[in-house]
Amino acid sequence: MSSLYTKLVKGATKIKMAPPKQKYVDPILSGTSSARGLQEITHALDIRLSDTAWTIVYKALIVLHLMIQQGEKDVTLRHYSHNLDVFQLRKISHTTKWSSNDMRALQRYDEYLKTRCEEYGRLGMDHLRDNYSSLKLGSKNQLSMDEELDHVESLEIQINALIRNKYSVSDLENHLLLYAFQLLVQDLLGLYNALNEGVITLLESFFELSIEHAKRTLDLYKDFVDMTEYVVRYLKIGKAVGLKIPVIKHITTKLINSLEEHLREETKRQRGEPSEPQQDRKPSTAISSTSSHNNNSNDKNKSIAQKKLEQIREQKRLLEQQLQNQQLLISPTVPQDAYNPFGSQQQDLNNDTFSFEPTQPQMTAQVPQPTANPFLIPQQQQQALQLTSASTMPQPSEIQITPNLNNQQTGMYASNLQYTPNFTGSGFGGYTTTENNAIMTGTLDPTKTGSNNPFSLENIAREQQQQNFQNSPNPFTLQQAQTTPILAHSQTGNPFQAQNVVTSPMGTYMTNPVAGQLQYASTGAQQQPQMMQGQQTGYVMVPTAFVPINQQQQQQQHQQENPNLIDI
């Protein structure tokens, strides 16, 4: 059995610069529950503490700290309170191969653990694991005032020894130092809460104390005020390295002047009546019989003392409520990010997935579901695109939606159409549109061959600009926006395949008799608009044509950048 615990201690205190592994620590903590196991573990630890390797000694102190904090209650403190010589670290102290900073960190950690054992031997109490509130004045165990003062003083001594273990944020990038620092922060939170409880208890009875006890209480309170500042700084380092530190609430630190004034007045009254025992002196009974001026002064002092007492009791009530909901630390087994008050926002940003899609706010479209009817047109939701026109003959059109494509120009044609209304004065349908064809710079235009082919791109565009139907018999007809009415059939022969069909809106005829306008916001890159205007007041007859592949790609890019959302 002895060899087992020796191997466990050696495994937990390897020379490797890393925290002790749980597979070694857990059996060691369990072994503290038996007297024989504790003896074997402490013997193995004493050997490791007398080593000359810095990491071995430092990790041995960590194991000892874990035994005090998480092992069998009181047994480790009791053992080492009678064996304080082990904390002298004679061998490593006489070696010169370690830097001064390394030795300082080792010695301060060693001194803190030694102080914990000394204070336990002096008072017989572990303030971290015992219920300190049950030992306060007026409780069942009824500590005397001297004992209460001793406990508060002991807590301040332990905290002072702890906060001397100073580490910078860069130091705590070392996982071994971070592990020890986390244990220290856990102890600091518990010790400071116990100290805060003790100070509150002393201040509650301060105005009823004897001069001797009041002076000692005032000195402890001053130390508490100074210590609070250092504790807050220490915990800020913990936040900076990612530890979850609960909000620390403590008794007010602004009572020093009031307590000193009360103590001076009480001392003067004590000197005026030396025959009366000092311990029986209270502000409520200190009434001078020499003059009415002294009588008024006593009443004033009494009211001030009562106000301070009520203030202290109210803070005590708030603190007790806060301490009941005390939070626990998160064990930083892996490096954690530093605390940021805007952490929630950063987390939301980190969770965003960027697909480099063209951003088109104020425009949403529903993807049409494939059906057997090629003339079934899905209704599109429109925000940026508003279309209001009057007509009586709807004409089917199809829209290709291509999501999740990058907004990049790859040398093909990129066009953006912008339509602006022109008033012609011809009845209700007196609006015409202006077509702006913008072609990306650095691209090639189709070669103009002057062909008479009716299906060529040049002839189709010329036909669309020249076809006007005047004198329509319908007085409510709204002339429609000129667009590029091209139907590109797929190479597979299926004219209804979604990814191969690209159609721009034909003449779209609405049933609203009120004249409207078509606004289309283009979001393309650098453009060179060429303005072409035309007027028409009748129906538009739109031919269809086969389009070369490069023109199909041009139109696909156009629709990806500015999808045409037509509401029929």
UniProtKB/Swiss-Prot annotation:
Location within or outside the cell: Bud; Bud neck; Cell membrane; Cytoplasm
Cross-link entry Glycyl lysine isopeptide (Lys-Gly) (interchain with G-Cter in ubiquitin), positions: 282
Residues with the Phosphothreonine modification: 449
Ranges for region Disordered: 262-302
Cellular component terms (Gene Ontology): cellular bud neck; clathrin-coated pit; clathrin-coated vesicle; cytosol; plasma membrane; prospore membrane
Role played: Involved in endocytosis and clathrin cage assembly.
Miscellaneous field: Present with 6800 molecules/cell in log phase SD medium.
Family affiliation: Belongs to the AP180 family.
Protein name in UniProt: Clathrin coat assembly protein AP180B
Species for this entry: Saccharomyces cerevisiae (strain ATCC 204508 / S288c) (Baker's yeast)
Name of the coding gene: YAP1802
